Amino acid sequence: MEFGNLYLTSKLKTIADADLKSNMLNHAYLLFGQDEIYLNYLAKQFAKHVLCKNNICGVCPTCKKIEKGVHADVLCYPKTDDKNIVVEDVNEIVEKAYVYPMEESKKIFILNNFDLATVQAQNKLLKTLEEPPKTSMFVLTSTNPSNILNTIKSRTKQVSVPLLEDKQIETFILNNSTLKLREVAPFVASSQGNLTKAKKIVDDPDFVKIKQLCLQIVLELNKSGDILKYSSKILSFKGRVTEVFDELSLVLLDCLYCKLNLLERVSNNQNINEFLSSNFSVKSLKLVYEELLNSQDKLKNNCNVNVVVDNFLITMLEVKHKWK
């Protein structure tokens, strides 16, 4: 994947610059946020930042080896994307941590998705983080830091990684897909600053269908007979109702912003005229949006999907007509 200069403008680079300048580089960092792809990318760039002697040049042997994943002193775990870190991995990490680096002054261990590591594996790593070798450094990433032992977190420098700007997401999508600039706006809006989500929806053949369905629901749900029609269409995306509701929330917000004349906040401006002419009132849109949030909570709590979808559409229609 092509990431451009995302690291150079990141919060992590600012922190790393300060730590390196003051010679206060920590032995362990925990990078946490919502975006798995971005976190894993940052961890690798951070390793380049620490080891490259030419300010993250990207072309020296150190940078090239780290990028290809073949640097002897930059070791990534888990070794494959379909695995989580287990005790056997940590045994190997601990053993290698006490071996002097082969090419650099420091050995860096990147532990991606550490919140998915087993409790046994986390406990096994704890002693090494408590008494770290002077020549080893650890970079952990996590999208759910609450699943990491507090004793582990307390021995790391924690860096909260924010989501990206829409322009950065747009550039990422254009660099990593066949989409044209005129086509990219709906994908950027639905990515919500998240590279992981951006990649998923760009690669998803059903994304455009889901987006179109959500537009139809907001603009064309007008009579009771439409409830069964749209309920069936939503449920046809088996196991993906939560994603449909996520998209629906974005469409509802866009419609609301149009009605409030806050056009600068509309994420996808291709449907502004339809939203402005829709028979939704501001009050009804706010109530429907609140009901959608409640429905999303019900899905998270494993309520019956069919019932949640039907009840939401019924409420949406009732509110739409009551508060014209």
What role is predicted for each listed range?
Residues N112-T118, L126, E130, S146:
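Catalytic acidic motif of RecA-like/P-loop NTPases
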Residues L31, L111, L125-L126, S142:
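Hydrophobic residues in beta-strands of the RecA-like P-loop NTPase core, especially within AAA+ ATPase
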